[in-house]
Structures are given as structure tokens and as C-alpha cells.
């Protein structure tokens, strides 16, 4: 009976030269996090007993990202078979199943991996299970040659006959391998090919020569996309977003124009939420039930509680906490601030490093002046307070509960609860001044003429 133990080897040492980037290929983000993290999250759902990530030299950033999973270094990039061999010391003589995956193939699903493991642990006891797929454009993919006895061979496109090239079943590179046979197979792979590399695909022929069976499982092209260029990264992003949008709608959210709403991998959206077109969610956003988010909003690192109305053109930055039933309107930016239940900041305001108390109203053009060039300071607006339009609150400062601040004020001192504070120059009126001024200017102009 096949073992239920599982080890995973993730190959992530590729240079990614086609990306034309100083960032390692597997670190390029999809939905707000590195593509390799998507893969590790999927694999973690299988509860593997061991996992090791194969990286290249000078890839410390990848090592930090995949931690606590261990990494091994492939000092010389001599092919996929050579990369797998680098994991031998970390895995040792593992007697379970070994999945070999690729850090630049981040969209593979847990369901597909479970099907591969079920095949590996099935009655045929195959030494190797290869994940195949049928792309719309088979191009120069290697082909899987399948017969009644299972997978007969993996043929590289350049070595394939015309008939084999007509075969639509292609090789994804993903494999499930019997751990008891893995190292015996890998150590016999040679580099007698045009590239002088050690190909993992050669283990199929070696296993069959040993009298073992090899089989395949077929996956979907969309989940087997390999990201090697920026154009493929864009395709992968679109596929990830399609999944996230579908999940949000399945969980009870309404997306007026789904294609224009962009989620992050960890966005949490409640039920009966309505999201209008052109909304972007950065990482770390939680939205409660019955929230309406109008168009052209950008949220990141924030909490939005039930019944909030936001937008259009609202920006919520990290640390923003918007309380139940609050209104955050057009061209309002909130950063590292708590807006309590029922408060309203309806237009043209900046609220940073602050608290806006329950039921308070912040008028158009109000800003919290939270930075003096060296330090950030806090603004505390009490419950039920009313801040008139075009007010500057110079932190640190406190406006008490129920207080009213007159429009155009520059508040630098504490306003006591229930008080009226007006801090602006007194209005002055000079009767007849405008008429005299116009006459003077007309006379000057006539004299010049």
C-alpha cells in the first residue's frame, strides 16, 4: 500500500532573464504577494511532512519570503533534474510521495495536486505521475506519449516525430514521484543532450526501463501557466483576479462591473456588499456586511465595518478603521485613523493619525496637520463634534465631544466639549472701496492710452 506521507520540492532557482528585472522571477507579485507565496499557500493545504525550496545563488530575498520552509542552493543551473538532486540532503531517504513543483507556476490548484497524489497512491503504484495539459497552442511544449500501459515517454518537441507533434497532450513539468525510487532515478539522469543539462523528464524512461509503471493526470491550461515574461505575468494576474472576483460574488457581494474591480490575495468582503466599477483593494483589507463602495476607490491595510458608505474617489490607507454606518465620501483620504460609528467625512478631506468620534461631522476641506517635518502627532475629534469647512487641525490637538469649529479655522489649542471655536482673522468691510478702486484703475489706464 502506498504511503500517505508527502514531501514537496519547489524549484525556484530560475534567473528569469526574460522578466528583465533585478527581482527574482518568483518574487514578482500576483494580487499583492509574490507568486511563489501563492504556490506555497496551495501546497500547505496538503499538510506536507517536508518541504524544501530550491533557489539560486544571491536569492536571499526568496529565502526570507518562503521561510519557515528551508531552502537549498543550486549553485550551477544545470537543469531540472540537477535542481531536484540538490534537495536530497534536505529530504534524505524519504519513503513517502514527493511532489515536484515550480515556483513560476503559481496558479496550480490543490484539487489538481490531490488528483495526482490519488493516482500515485492508487492500485497501479506508478513510480512517476506526470501532470499533462492540452493548451490551445501546443507550440514547442514537450509531448506526453500515452499507451494502454500508461505513460510511455516524454518527448521534447525538437525530438518529436511529425505524428507526435500532432499529439495535443503536453508536459507541464509537474510530477508526483515515489520517494523510495526518486534518488535512484535522479542519480542516473545524464546530460547527454544539446544543452548539456540534466532533465527531470528523463526519469520516466528510466523508471520504465526498471519495469515500473508511469502514468499521467490531466490539468487545465489556465492553472499551469508558467510565468517567464511580463506579458505572462499580466495573464496570470488576470486569471488570479478572475478567481478572486468569482469568490467574492459567490460569498454574497455584488460587483457592478467585475472586470474593473481588483482584489488582493487576502481581501475579505462581507455579504451584501456592493462594489461599483474601478475599485482597487491593496493587501490587508477587510470589509463588513452591507457596505457600498462607489467607483474609483483605493483601499489598503484597512478595516471597514458594516453599513459604511464610501466613495466615489475615497482612499483608505494602512491603519484606517471605519466604524459601522460611517460615511467616507469623495476625495477623502484616511490614514492610521479611527472613524467611529456614524461619523461623516463626506468630501475633500485628509484625516491622518486621528480619531473621529461617533456621529461627528467633518466638513469639506478639513485636514489634520499631523506632521511637523520630524514627528507625527495625534488629532482627537470627539463624538458629535462638528468641524466646519476648510478647517486645519494642527496636531497634537483635541476637539471635545459636541464642540463646533467654525469654517476656515486653524485650531492649535484644545476645544472644550460643547464649545464653539473660531480661529480666523476678523472680517473687515470698507464701504465704497470697490467703486473707488475701479475708478482709480480706469483713470490710470486712460492716462497711459
From Swiss-Prot:
<feature type="region of interest" description="Pyrophosphorylase">
    <location>
        <begin position="1"/>
        <end position="230"/>
    </location>
</feature>
<dbReference type="GO" id="GO:0005737">
    <property type="term" value="C:cytoplasm"/>
</dbReference>
<comment type="similarity">
    <text>In the C-terminal section; belongs to the transferase hexapeptide repeat family.</text>
</comment>
<dbReference type="GO" id="GO:0006048">
    <property type="term" value="P:UDP-N-acetylglucosamine biosynthetic process"/>
</dbReference>
<feature type="binding site">
    <location>
        <begin position="11"/>
        <end position="14"/>
    </location>
    <ligand>
        <name>UDP-N-acetyl-alpha-D-glucosamine</name>
    </ligand>
</feature>
<dbReference type="GO" id="GO:0019134">
    <property type="term" value="F:glucosamine-1-phosphate N-acetyltransferase activity"/>
</dbReference>
<feature type="binding site">
    <location>
        <position position="156"/>
    </location>
    <ligand>
        <name>UDP-N-acetyl-alpha-D-glucosamine</name>
    </ligand>
</feature>
<comment type="similarity">
    <text>In the N-terminal section; belongs to the N-acetylglucosamine-1-phosphate uridyltransferase family.</text>
</comment>
<dbReference type="GO" id="GO:0000287">
    <property type="term" value="F:magnesium ion binding"/>
</dbReference>
<keyword id="KW-0961">Cell wall biogenesis/degradation</keyword>
<dbReference type="InterPro" id="IPR029044">
    <property type="entry name" value="Nucleotide-diphossugar_trans"/>
</dbReference>
<dbReference type="GO" id="GO:0008360">
    <property type="term" value="P:regulation of cell shape"/>
</dbReference>
<comment type="pathway">
    <text>Nucleotide-sugar biosynthesis; UDP-N-acetyl-alpha-D-glucosamine biosynthesis; UDP-N-acetyl-alpha-D-glucosamine from N-acetyl-alpha-D-glucosamine 1-phosphate: step 1/1.</text>
</comment>
<feature type="binding site">
    <location>
        <position position="335"/>
    </location>
    <ligand>
        <name>UDP-N-acetyl-alpha-D-glucosamine</name>
    </ligand>
</feature>
<dbReference type="InterPro" id="IPR018357">
    <property type="entry name" value="Hexapep_transf_CS"/>
</dbReference>
<dbReference type="InterPro" id="IPR050065">
    <property type="entry name" value="GlmU-like"/>
</dbReference>
<comment type="subunit">
    <text>Homotrimer.</text>
</comment>
<keyword id="KW-0133">Cell shape</keyword>
<keyword id="KW-0677">Repeat</keyword>
<feature type="binding site">
    <location>
        <begin position="79"/>
        <end position="80"/>
    </location>
    <ligand>
        <name>UDP-N-acetyl-alpha-D-glucosamine</name>
    </ligand>
</feature>
<dbReference type="GO" id="GO:0071555">
    <property type="term" value="P:cell wall organization"/>
</dbReference>
<feature type="binding site">
    <location>
        <begin position="102"/>
        <end position="104"/>
    </location>
    <ligand>
        <name>UDP-N-acetyl-alpha-D-glucosamine</name>
    </ligand>
</feature>
<feature type="binding site">
    <location>
        <position position="171"/>
    </location>
    <ligand>
        <name>UDP-N-acetyl-alpha-D-glucosamine</name>
    </ligand>
</feature>
<feature type="region of interest" description="N-acetyltransferase">
    <location>
        <begin position="252"/>
        <end position="449"/>
    </location>
</feature>
<dbReference type="GO" id="GO:0003977">
    <property type="term" value="F:UDP-N-acetylglucosamine diphosphorylase activity"/>
</dbReference>
<keyword id="KW-0479">Metal-binding</keyword>
<dbReference type="GO" id="GO:0009245">
    <property type="term" value="P:lipid A biosynthetic process"/>
</dbReference>
<feature type="binding site">
    <location>
        <position position="361"/>
    </location>
    <ligand>
        <name>UDP-N-acetyl-alpha-D-glucosamine</name>
    </ligand>
</feature>
<feature type="binding site">
    <location>
        <begin position="370"/>
        <end position="371"/>
    </location>
    <ligand>
        <name>acetyl-CoA</name>
    </ligand>
</feature>
<dbReference type="InterPro" id="IPR005882">
    <property type="entry name" value="Bifunctional_GlmU"/>
</dbReference>
<keyword id="KW-0963">Cytoplasm</keyword>
<feature type="binding site">
    <location>
        <position position="364"/>
    </location>
    <ligand>
        <name>acetyl-CoA</name>
    </ligand>
</feature>
<feature type="binding site">
    <location>
        <position position="142"/>
    </location>
    <ligand>
        <name>UDP-N-acetyl-alpha-D-glucosamine</name>
    </ligand>
</feature>
<dbReference type="GO" id="GO:0016020">
    <property type="term" value="C:membrane"/>
</dbReference>
<feature type="binding site">
    <location>
        <position position="407"/>
    </location>
    <ligand>
        <name>acetyl-CoA</name>
    </ligand>
</feature>
<keyword id="KW-0573">Peptidoglycan synthesis</keyword>
<keyword id="KW-0460">Magnesium</keyword>
<feature type="binding site">
    <location>
        <position position="104"/>
    </location>
    <ligand>
        <name>Mg(2+)</name>
    </ligand>
</feature>
<protein>
    <recommendedName>
        <fullName>Bifunctional protein GlmU</fullName>
        <ecNumber>2.7.7.23</ecNumber>
        <ecNumber>2.3.1.157</ecNumber>
    </recommendedName>
</protein>
<feature type="region of interest" description="Linker">
    <location>
        <begin position="231"/>
        <end position="251"/>
    </location>
</feature>
<feature type="active site" description="Proton acceptor">
    <location>
        <position position="347"/>
    </location>
</feature>
<dbReference type="InterPro" id="IPR025877">
    <property type="entry name" value="MobA-like_NTP_Trfase"/>
</dbReference>
